[in-house]
């Protein structure tokens, strides 16, 4: 898959993405305050800002945020969602070409977007827009498999019915990808617990928000939805299920050596 193709993958998923994707827990801010010295006056470039899930966390902290998003539909959804925040500026740009000024931000963040970047070009761009000794923070929500049968059943559904799930899953970042991106710069890894409580509508919407989930008319759609309903019925309590995640965070300074 080309990086250009990746930037359009979610165009027909925007409403479900905005409504049903998990956000990021407030302890993310506590961690960045403690480890990176995050303060409200710091400026954030949120790359692949999408519908604004991470941008909003920083805006509530008092930060000015540039939301850089290449997908028009996602960008418009983010603009609508964050319209009440004076500190938000929407940018039609990408990780490789943000359009931001040199040395203009203290933090570059990427939530659930790192695997869509062209790494070398993105690293050069981030070093350009970061102030000296600025921070790069990459994070994403990863479903917990070990002690949660629901997430294991859900994973099995994706593997069975997802259109190109394996290729997308193989592109998800691993520690070696993060290490390659930071090159000789040091970075730190942390995991924070996160979860969603979903009724049937939310559980369906969570699936439909994924770019690899077949849509109506695809031969996999009807059997996929039947299996999803079976999973929901098996795990629901009082009409709701709890989807468990880790919010995985990697952060470090980009020095440009």
Model-derived segments and their meaning:
Residues 96-107:
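A short acidic, Gly/Pro-enriched loop at the edge of an enzyme's catalytic core
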Residues 106-120:
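A short SAM/SAH-binding and catalytic strip from SAM-dependent methyltransferases
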Residues 33, 56-59, 123, 127:
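A structural alpha-helix within SAM-dependent methyltransferase catalytic domains
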Residues 1-42:
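Conserved class I S-adenosyl-L-methionine
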Residues 51, 175-257:
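Conserved Class I S-adenosyl-L-methionine
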């Amino acid at each position: 898959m080309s990086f250009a193709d990746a930037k359009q993958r979610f165009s027909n998923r925007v409403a479900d993405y905005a409504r049903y994707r998990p956000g990021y827990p407030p302890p993310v801010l506590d961690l960045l305050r403690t480890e990176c010295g995050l303060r409200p006056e710091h400026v954030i470039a949120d790359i692949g800002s999408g519908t604004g899930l991470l941008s909003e966390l920083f805006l509530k902290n008092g930060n000015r945020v540039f939301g850089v998003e290449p997908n028009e539909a996602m960008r418009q959804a983010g603009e609508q969602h964050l319209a009440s925040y004076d500190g938000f500026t929407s940018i039609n740009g990408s990780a490789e070409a943000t359009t931001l000024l040199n040395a203009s931000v203290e933090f570059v963040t990427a939530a659930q977007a790192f695997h869509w970047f062209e790494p070398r070009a993105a690293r050069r761009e981030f070093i350009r827009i970061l102030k000296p000794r600025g921070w790069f923070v990459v994070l994403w929500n990863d479903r917990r498999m070990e002690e949660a049968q629901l997430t294991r059943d859900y994973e099995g559904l994706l593997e069975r019915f997802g259109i190109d799930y394996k290729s997308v899953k193989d592109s998800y970042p691993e520690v070696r990808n993060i290490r390659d991106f930071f090159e000789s710069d040091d970075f730190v890894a942390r995991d924070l617990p996160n979860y969603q409580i979903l009724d049937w509508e939310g559980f369906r919407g969570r699936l439909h928000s994924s770019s690899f989930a077949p849509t109506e008319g695809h031969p996999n759609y009807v059997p996929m939805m039947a299996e999803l309903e079976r999973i929901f019925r098996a795990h629901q309590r009082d009409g709701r299920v709890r989807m468990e995640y880790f919010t995985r965070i990697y952060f470090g300074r980009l020095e440009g050596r």
